[in-house]
Regions:
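Basic, flexible Lys/Arg- and Gly-enriched helix-loop patches that mediate nucleic-acid binding at interfaces
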Residues: 2-186
Length: 186
């Protein structure tokens, strides 16, 4: 099995490909005890890859975990603003995990984690055709006309957003509960 070093690191569950490229550019990655000088170098499964002295191995078995993400928590490994991350809630003895997609900082709900970067990417792509369900609570009354517009697609600031399925779950004089079914995160 031959693949680029950045992909190898991502598939091993160490970090994303972009983060792997940054580590390579910072001269933190070694292949068979030789400094890796570019993220496009091909490696084989039996090559010895180290990052900061730690041996990186491919995960043969894809693992999948589910987690409840509370509000005011971010879906990243390192936050420059020092906010809490979902990874701080994981058990200390848990293998390295990658979030599959993200939820906004103020959002709460189910988030999936895996140990395999390729698997995460496949599930994140709109072409995977996986339906994501979001419940949104709005502190106002929503008109059924507005829902129809969203269901048929809308243009916001000159950008056409594809149609999505939105339904009103509950509504009273002060607030509305909406259910969104999306095939992509935008």
């Amino acid at each position: 099995l031959i693949m680029r070093i950045a992909k190898f690191i991502s598939n091993a569950g160490y970090c994303s490909r972009r983060e792997a490229e940054k580590l390579i550019n910072k001269k933190k990655v070694y292949i068979n005890k030789k400094l890796c000088v570019a993220p496009n170098i091909n490696v084989m499964e039996n090559d010895k890859i180290t990052i900061n002295g730690n041996i990186i191995k491919l995960n043969k078995k894809i693992r999948l975990w589910k987690m409840y993400k509370p509000t005011n928590v971010i879906c990243t490994n390192n936050d420059p603003k020092k906010r809490k991350t979902i990874f701080e809630f994981l058990p200390k003895n848990m293998p390295r995990a990658i979030s599959i997609g993200r939820l906004d900082f103020m959002s709460e709900g189910l988030i999936l984690l895996t140990n395999n970067g390729d698997f995460a990417r496949k599930l994140e792509l709109p072409s995977s055709n996986i339906i994501r369900i979001y419940r949104v609570y709005i502190a106002t009354v929503v008109k059924s006309n507005d829902i129809k517009k969203i269901n048929y697609g809308v243009i916001i600031n000159g950008i056409l957003y594809k149609k999505i399925e939105v339904t009103i779950e509950k509504m009273n004089q002060k607030k509305t509960s909406l259910k969104f079914k999306l095939r992509e995160g935008k």
